[in-house]
Amino acid sequence: MQIHSGRFKGLRIKTVKNAPYRPTTSIVRKSLFDILKNISGKNMLDLFSGSGIIGFEALSRGAKTITFVDSSLRVNSLLKMNSILFKEEEINFFKNDVFKFLKSCDSFDYIFADPPYKFNEIDRLIPQAISCLNDDGIFILESSPQEYSISPYRVNEYGDTQLTFWKKN
């Protein structure tokens, strides 16, 4: 996978065959960062991190810090290996259950979540993620197209992928 924009444009991050995740497609990633616009100096939380491409792209585009949370040891090992390419960047790693992490986390400017396909606790995830946002923060959920119990302020669809956005305020 390749970084599309910013200081690390063109840099390739390693992925694994038969990975326990599905990376965000190039088109969805470009659209996400076009929507967010300037993320310079912001801190971002990447839940269900998988390949980490969203967090690494955010760093390349000027994010101040990225925090990866994934419960898989294999995923965390790959994230740490890829982070070596991003020298001197502030990157945090947590091998943890997302809900346990959200109970005690700091606040973030952006929280991105791309849960597994058959994840059935999205309605539980949304309010917990929103509660960990800074006052003007945005929570972004990547999923298959669907509706949620908490109304978002924006929804963008890309074939069988949907980006749904919630603001704290």
Model segments located where?
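Class I S-adenosyl-L-methionine-dependent methyltransferase catalytic core
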Residues: M1-N169
